[in-house]
Amino acid sequence: MLICNDNLNQKTLLEEIMALRPWRKGPFEISKIKIDSEWDSSIKWDLVKNATSLKDKIVADVGCNNGYYLFKMLEHGPKSLVGFDPGVLVKKQFEFLAPFFDKEKKIIYKSLGVEDLNEKYPNAFDVIFCLGVLYHRKSPLETLKALYHALKIGGELVLDTLIIDSPLDIALCPKKTYAKMKNAYFIPSISALKGWCERVGFGDFEIISVLKTTPKEQRKTDFILGQSLEDFLDKKDHSKTLEGYDAPLRGYFKMLKSSSKR
């Protein structure tokens, strides 16, 4: 949890926090008020925080949401940090949080998507984190290509995506929704994902971890509006989504840009 012990008016603070719902990423604690977000993002961060050194590196978080991971990255001594997310509400959440967790104003927040990287940030970063974005993109290869071109030669990508458990080079393409998500388009096997990454130029593909999503990591709280994981799974068989697909399984990966070709 990210904690700030500034002494503030708790009633006013809580009103501000609740006006910014839903809080997807967190948790945070400000002046003893805990923002109990839908996702316990510390679980994911613990998996990827030591994937590569951030010390004195130029680092990006693509799909950064409200900045939770950016605030955690500050603890690892990067040279600079840039977050990218086109969402309006999550930027407002970041602007609310930054005075508490980025008091030296080291983080740059850009309201841009991954598709903007090619033109505006070629060969710009030593490390890119792209967590929970790929399966939301209609063209995963173009997304990986944009991430590739935004890295310097020798740069590293840390990627998290939904995956399917299969030895084949295949991807699940949900008919309408996956776990009630309308914007889940391609959910690859690890083998298929590795092939995609190699096709755009990445090498040294490494599996960091594979983890099932559980109610410990994602659940309903008072700080979100609406449903969460328990509502997305089959009531009688939690190994399946409501649509009958396998329940969410996430893979965490690291890979290297070894050349500027492609």
From Swiss-Prot:
What is this enzyme's catalytic activity, as reactions? carboxy-S-adenosyl-L-methionine + 5-hydroxyuridine(34) in tRNA = 5-carboxymethoxyuridine(34) in tRNA + S-adenosyl-L-homocysteine + H(+)
Top-level taxon of the source organism: Bacteria
Which Gene3D superfamilies does the annotation name?
Vaccinia Virus protein VP39
Annotated GO biological process:
tRNA wobble uridine modification
- CDD domains on file: AdoMet_MTases (cd02440)
Annotated positions binding carboxy-S-adenosyl-L-methionine: 25, 39, 44, 63, 114-115, 135, 250
**What keywords is this UniProt entry annotated with?**
Transferase, tRNA processing
tRNA processing found in the keyword field? yes
One GO term in the molecular function aspect is:
transferase activity, transferring alkyl or aryl (other than methyl) groups
Q: What is its EC number?
A: 2.5.1.-
Entry annotated with the keyword Endoplasmic reticulum: no
**Pfam families attached to this UniProt entry:** Methyltransf_9
Instruction: Write out the coiled-coil annotation as residue ranges.
Output: none
Q: What does this protein do?
A: Catalyzes carboxymethyl transfer from carboxy-S-adenosyl-L-methionine (Cx-SAM) to 5-hydroxyuridine (ho5U) to form 5-carboxymethoxyuridine (cmo5U) at position 34 in tRNAs.
Subunit structure of this chain's protein: Homotetramer.
* Family of this protein: Belongs to the class I-like SAM-binding methyltransferase superfamily. CmoB family.
What's the protein here called? tRNA U34 carboxymethyltransferase
Species source reads Helicobacter acinonychis (strain Sheeba)
Upper classification of the organism: Bacteria, Pseudomonadati, Campylobacterota, Epsilonproteobacteria, Campylobacterales
Q: Which gene encodes it?
A: cmoB
